[in-house]
Amino acid sequence: MVKIGINEFGRIGRLAFRRIYEL
């Protein structure tokens, strides 16, 4: 459960963080 959450967040989080950082 924790591994999947981190894996999913790492992929989606990285994309979301890049968009927010660009703003």
Swiss-Prot record:
It comes from the Bacteria. Keywords: Glycosyltransferase, Transferase. One of its GO terms (molecular function) is thymidine phosphorylase activity. InterPro entries: NAD(P)-bd_dom_sf (IPR036291). Its EC number is 2.4.2.4. It catalyses: thymidine + phosphate = 2-deoxy-alpha-D-ribose 1-phosphate + thymine. The enzymes which catalyze the reversible phosphorolysis of pyrimidine nucleosides are involved in the degradation of these compounds and in their utilization as carbon and energy sources, or in the rescue of pyrimidine bases for nucleotide synthesis. Homodimer. This is Thymidine phosphorylase. It comes from Lacticaseibacillus rhamnosus (Lactobacillus rhamnosus).
